[in-house]
Regions:
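Short, intrinsically disordered N-terminal pre-domain segments
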Residues: 1-32
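Surface-exposed ligand/attachment interfaces on beta-rich extracellular proteins
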Residues: 27-38, 50-67, 93-95, 127-130
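Short carbohydrate-recognition loop motifs
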Residues: 44-49
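Hydrophobic beta-strand segments within beta-rich accessory/binding domains
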Residues: 55-61, 71-77, 120-124
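Exposed aromatic-hydrophobic patches
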Residues: 58-60, 106-114
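Short, surface-exposed beta-strand/strand-loop-strand elements in extracellular ectodomains
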Residues: 67-98
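Short beta-strand segments within Ig-like beta-sandwich modules, predominantly Fibronectin type-III
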Residues: 99-103
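Noncatalytic modules at the cell exterior or secretory-pathway interfaces
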Residues: 112-131
Length: 131
């Protein structure tokens, strides 16, 4: 059985009056089971150099992705400029996607995704700086 885990740790000694450390681990499983993930569409890297909203994930282009499965999405802004950002959204680029986050240089996000929703994952860069 495959075992895939996602872990986050956020430590800080000066964010509050006392030191803070938050840590959490999730074991990723196949939808509706205790079985580890057995499928992946793989990892892909895309270089963005446009300030035009773009589909990062177009659900219609992914075979078998319309079923209610346990999908996870990881997005990272590999840029180093802290004044440039990517706005990540859910929805159709011909409409108004719902913004779910803004990733500055070095930022990342990991979120569950319902492929059954038919909604795409979009990216809108703050400018045409390649990242």
């Amino acid at each position: 059985m495959a075992t895939t885990t996602a872990q986050i740790t956020i430590p800080s000694s000066d964010i509050a009056d006392n030191a803070v450390s938050i840590s959490n681990t999730a074991t990723l499983t196949t939808a509706g089971t205790a079985t580890g993930l057995t499928e992946t569409t793989g990892l892909a890297r895309r270089k963005m150099a446009s300030s035009t909203i773009t589909d990062l994930i177009t659900i219609a282009n992914i075979a078998g992705f319309s079923a209610a499965k346990s999908a996870k999405v990881y997005i990272r802004n590999t840029g180093t400029l802290t004044d440039k950002y990517a706005i990540i959204g859910i929805g159709d680029i011909t409409g108004t996607p719902t913004t779910i986050g803004r990733l500055y240089g070095g930022d990342w996000m990991f979120f569950p995704y319902d492929g059954n929703s038919g909604e795409d994952v979009t990216i809108d860069m703050s400018d045409a700086t390649a990242t």
